[in-house]
């Protein structure tokens, strides 16, 4: 944050894209059953998907605490929706993204108290044809498997239509609100 602060006094758009679903080098992969969970794997996934983004936002401090237009977006996932969970599994990923969504909501409430123009959201990019989703693309219809460029374009469109009324929400690539 110090390096960023040396270049600007305020940020108006922050998009945090770091995330982990699997990392074979440390044995992290989506769990099919609760017995597959370990503390170290759970901590690794939470560290990247939840703790990292929000500790970074906290470190940004005054750069995002102003009264000008502000959008802070963190990549989330539809799979984090408690109300939409019909399959179970993927415990650490789902839980970390659900916790991320709660922190998104909390940050939105905190910043809106002093900046009614702040919009803090989670963004669901859809299923993107990357190494992260490769092993899990089997049942995805071809029109719902996006190239990284296509997903980025959809999310850019969403970012450009956000209003303060959407703050605290998780929004899909097509602009639809995802139920918590």
Locate the predicted segments by residue:
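A structural motif corresponding to the C-terminal end of an alpha-helix
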Residues: 55-63, 107, 117-118, 161, ...
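Conserved hydrophobic beta-strands of the Rossmann-like cofactor-binding core
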Residues: 10, 14-15, 19
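Short-chain dehydrogenase/reductase
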Residues: 1, 57, 104, 152-155
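C-terminal helical subdomain
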Residues: 122, 130, 134-180
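Hydrophobic structural elements of the Rossmann-like NAD(P)H-binding subdomain
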Residues: 15, 73, 120-123, 133
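Conserved Rossmann-fold cofactor-binding substructure of NAD(P)-dependent oxidoreductases
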Residues: 1-10
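Catalytic loop of short-chain dehydrogenase/reductase
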Residues: 20-25, 30-50, 55, 65-114, ...
């Amino acid at each position: 944050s110090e390096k960023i602060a040396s270049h600007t006094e305020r940020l108006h758009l922050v998009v945090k894209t770091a995330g982990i679903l699997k990392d074979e080098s440390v044995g992290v992969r989506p769990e099919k059953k609760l017995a597959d969970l370990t503390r170290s794997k759970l901590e690794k996934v939470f560290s990247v998907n939840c703790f990292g983004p929000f500790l970074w936002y906290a470190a940004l401090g005054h750069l995002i605490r102003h009264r000008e237009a502000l959008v802070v977006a963190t990549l989330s996932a539809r799979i984090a929706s408690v109300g939409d969970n019909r399959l179970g599994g993927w415990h650490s990923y789902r839980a970390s993204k659900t916790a991320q969504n709660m922190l998104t909501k909390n940050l939105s409430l905190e910043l809106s108290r002093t900046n009614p123009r702040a919009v803090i959201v989670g963004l669901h990019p859809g299923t993107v044809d990357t190494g992260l989703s490769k092993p899990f693309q089997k049942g995805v219809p071809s029109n719902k498997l996006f190239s990284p460029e296509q997903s980025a374009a959809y999310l850019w469109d969403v970012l450009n239509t956000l209003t303060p009324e959407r703050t605290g929400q998780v929004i899909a690539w097509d602009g639809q609100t995802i139920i918590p």
